[in-house]
């Protein structure tokens, strides 16, 4: 039942399969960068989750180092990424994962000679 004057809360994300070829592709900035939105919404337990995959051209970064309240997981699928978290720099390759806690300065860039492909999972309380 909806109470007059109150917005109805959005429905929780349903269980679903996501086929890679069906994901919408969006150009991201200039050059070869692009991203694929996978999902964005609230889970049944109340957490907001957003997942996207990005392709980044050799030598490029998606944006300057920054901070934000939400937390992120970054999973490298292809290429070599240089990840900086709180001033600590490491190179990560396929299968590697980085976790960025709330309000910690971070950034990443493709330091390889070919494209890098990675997935970002954003977690909001």
What are the functions of these language-model segments?
Residues 2-48:
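A short, N-terminal "cap"/entry segment at the start of jelly-roll beta-barrel domains
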Residues 42-49, 69, 84, 104, ...:
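Mature, secreted membrane-active peptide modules
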Residues 50-68, 102:
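Conserved short histidine dyad/triad with adjacent acidic residue
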Residues 51-55, 73, 97-99, 120:
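Conserved hydrophobic/aromatic beta-strand scaffold that supports enzyme active sites
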Residues 69-81, 86:
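Glycine- and acidic-residue-biased ligand/ion/polar-headgroup-sensing regions
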Residues 88-103:
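Short acidic-glycine-tyrosine-enriched beta hairpin
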Residues 102-125:
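Ligand-binding loop in jelly-roll beta-barrel domains
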